[in-house]
Amino acid sequence: MKVAVLGAAGGIGQALALLLKTQLPSGSELSLYDIAPVTPGVAVDLSHIPTAVKIKGFSGEDATPALEGADVVLISAGVARKPGMDRSDLFNVNAGIVKNLVQQVAKNCPKACIGIITNPVNTTVAIAAEVLKKAGVYDKNKLFGVTTLDIIRSNTFVAELKGKQPGEVEVPVIGGHSGVTILPLLSQVPGVSFTEQEVADLTKRIQNAGTEVVEAKAGGGSATLSMGQAAARFGLSLVRALQGEQGVVECAYVEGDGQYARFFSQPLLLGKNGVEERKSIGTLSAFEQNALEGMLDTLKKDIALGKEFVNK
């Protein structure tokens, strides 16, 4: 199994690469790519860690050598948020980066599963889909927006509030991956109940958690380490499912049946070909139903922006 990380010299990319080097199954290959000249050195650094995962790093304009034969491609390349910026302020720079890299994926490993980490995910996934379509290689079961950070944050905050072990809590999060489009389904967490105020406060904290980190880092960066962990969790789940493990479920932002929006984050059963089944979002509370209806305009606009970017 070969996994490629594009944007591997950045804060998320390095954290992700470290976790994959230590946790991918023995015999896996890991290839790192970034425009930055330091990238081969990041691979050499990681190569000294004693795990049976072969690693190589590539830099420059051409990602081809990193992509050849890749089964999974995780894209974290782009600029990070600064204080006062919304994820959508990143759009102008990151849209071009994602378009370029996905064109290279389409050419070199068209059958790979692609996980988009680069923000704004609501829009960059739509860009990737249009690029893959134009190249004639789009498979909606193999393109994912990685929203796992919303899930791990939800798990952490709920566990803290309710005195649970974080590993025992799993909160489904649906919708998109910024602001009001992030909707944790707190009513579906087994064995835990919340007051209306707790639901309102937790939902807001989960939606604004990225800003919490940006402000705490005081201009020195955004959520890179927790995002690296989230991306690793998603990437490793995908690898396990591709290798035939049964019952692997993760939430991610994918093209579905369009019931809510063309792209929508929901629980997915993963399998040998990517998405095996888009699972139902279940019964929502009145608060969640309201929040869902209230986000759809924003989500649809974000998606339209991506489509327009590629077709302009």
From Swiss-Prot:
Annotated keywords: NAD, Oxidoreductase, Tricarboxylic acid cycle
Catalytic activity: (S)-malate + NAD(+) = oxaloacetate + NADH + H(+)
Binding positions (substrate): R81, R87, N119, R153
Pfam families: Ldh_1_C, Ldh_1_N
UniProt key word Oxidoreductase: yes
Enzyme Commission identifier(s): 1.1.1.37
Any one annotated GO CC term: cytoplasm
Family indicated by similarity: Belongs to the LDH/MDH superfamily. MDH type 1 family.
Function: Catalyzes the reversible oxidation of malate to oxaloacetate.
Protein name per Swiss-Prot or TrEMBL: Malate dehydrogenase
Organism of provenance: Shigella flexneri
